[in-house]
Design a protein with these regions (language model features):
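Active-site-proximal loop/helix segment associated with metal-binding centers of metalloenzymes
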Residues: 123-184
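Residues that form or immediately flank small-molecule/cofactor binding pockets and catalytic motifs
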Residues: 90, 111, 127, 223, ...
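Short, solvent-exposed aromatic-acidic interface loops
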Residues: 250-261
Length: 261
């Protein structure tokens, strides 16, 4: 349950931050120090990072984008803002070491946020893509304790190399698909009914939109990509704000984040 003093919450997902996305990473850091300051709670619903191969990533090598983001989140949390992070399909290996370094809490997927009596289902969204059977099989495997333990026992350079190979394979598979798998609205409706809720917020699909169906709202978050060509449809960075006083959902472009490098 959200503390009764919370009035303004910000939701983001699919930022895919890392050394490979310098403009997006810089934009998020600017936003965190500006517009995001108004939020009592920040909810990052998956894929904060493009890849995460283990919390020991923060203990080796010279500081990079991963270190910068974690330090900024820690400073943000230290100033009194609650930071909640959910696993995505890219950074499902985030663990308590990361959470401790960032002064953040890890959210289960899915979970229910109770804000002033309103129950809101939060999820990354990948588990709703029921038509993508191969991915769901992979998801079940890599979220298992046995697979993760085996992967994390490998040396860090080997894990980084494997993660890069998996991302390349994923991009190749997506390029061969006629359409990307989308969230199943019937599955989402079942989740909402099971949670006794009428609201859902998720990301993953990179298709920001409000979906209304039989009095149920499914709000899909935007991805962030400030490294894409300026002016293009994919050059965007948006946060969803929920204001408790009016229970208003407002998707806002992040002006501080969208300054082109």
């Amino acid at each position: 349950m959200a503390p009764p003093t919370w009035r303004h919450l910000a939701f983001v997902s699919d930022l895919h931050l890392g050394p490979e996305a310098p403009a997006t990473t810089a934009g998020f850091l600017r936003w965190l120090g500006a517009e995001a300051w108004a939020a009592d709670g920040l909810f990052i619903l998956g894929d904060l990072f493009e890849a995460w191969v283990g919390d020991d990533l923060l203990d080796t090598g010279p500081p990079d984008a991963h270190h910068q983001v974690c330090a900024a989140l820690a400073a943000y949390a230290a100033d009194g803002h609650a930071v909640h992070v959910m696993h995505g399909n890219r950074d499902f290996l985030l663990q308590q070491g990361f959470a401790h370094r960032c002064n953040a809490s890890l959210l289960p997927d899915p979970c229910v946020l109770d804000l002033g009596g309103q129950r809101i289902v939060l999820t990354h969204g990948d588990a709703l893509c029921t038509s993508d059977a191969p991915y769901l099989q992979w998801r079940a495997l890599c979220r298992g304790a046995e697979w993760q333990a085996r992967f994390l026992t490998q040396p860090l350079p080997a894990r980084i190399e494997q993660a890069a190979a998996m991302r390349a394979q994923s991009r190749a598979s997506q390029s061969r698909m006629d359409t990307w798998s989308d969230a199943d609205p019937f599955e989402a409706a079942r989740w909402l009914q099971a949670a006794n809720s009428r609201w859902m917020i998720h990301g993953h699909t990179h298709r920001p939109r409000e979906h209304w169906d039989h009095g149920q709202l499914r709000q899909v978050l935007s991805d962030w990509d400030l490294d894409a060509p300026a002016g293009g449809a994919s050059h965007r960075a948006q946060a969803l704000w929920l204001h408790a006083g009016s229970m208003e959902l407002a998707a806002e472009r992040c002006p501080g984040a969208c300054i082109h490098r």
